[in-house]
Amino acid sequence: MVGALELEERPQSLGEEIANSVSHGIGLLAALVAFPILVTAALQRGDLGGTVGASVFAITMVLLYLASTLFHALPACRAKRVFQILDHSAIYLLIAGTYTPFTLGVLRGAWGWTLFGLVWVLAVVGTVFKALGGVRYTTFSTWVYLAMGWLVLIAIEPVWTLVPKWGLFWLLAGGIAYTAGAVFFMAERIRYFHFVWHLFVVAGTACHFLAVLWYAV
């Protein structure tokens, strides 16, 4: 477990950590505001799948921004290392959480449950991998994040048919934002690239929030 609690290779400077924690702190506040909006909208519609999906998405959104904000805000200590692992693990959970309102509330049926099962199995495996292996193999984990995010392409036909076109637009925009941000995440040895990654994450989450709110609940 000592190896599992190693920090990332290049420690972030104080200025970088301030930018990192503030950026995702703002994301956390936005997620806390978005939570009741999503759940209320789903409850008003009265659909169980949509309500469960919106709740899961909202919870995983808050978890990611909370873990990230605390990790970057804390000074170097054991708690910081723990929150770094939670931060990386929460990415798996948010990806699966983003799928959930669409798989349970829109796709349903065989494709809905297949995608739901696949992404959540991958999320659980990824989380366990992070818990046991820590933040090593970051590049490998990033490719897994991207593969999970674009896994939806295996169900492109039913998704294209059942998700309204503007819903597809916001889903695609969010996916592109996350993917573009991953480039900066993998090149975070360059100063403030991790902060740029954070900005892309906030943008991607905002796009997916609109997709869920307007087209999945």
Predicted regions mapped to residue ranges:
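Multi-pass alpha-helical transmembrane bundles in non-GPCR membrane proteins
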Residues: 1-217
